[in-house]
Amino acid sequence: APTAFYGVR
């Protein structure tokens, strides 16, 4: 998943 949207997940 793109870090720019989710950060950390």
From Swiss-Prot:
The modification Arginine amide is found at R9. Keywords: Amidation, Neuropeptide, Secreted. It comes from the Eukaryota. One of its GO terms (cellular component) is extracellular region. The keyword Lyase does not apply. The keyword Secreted applies. Myoactive peptide. This is Callitachykinin-1. It comes from Calliphora vomitoria.
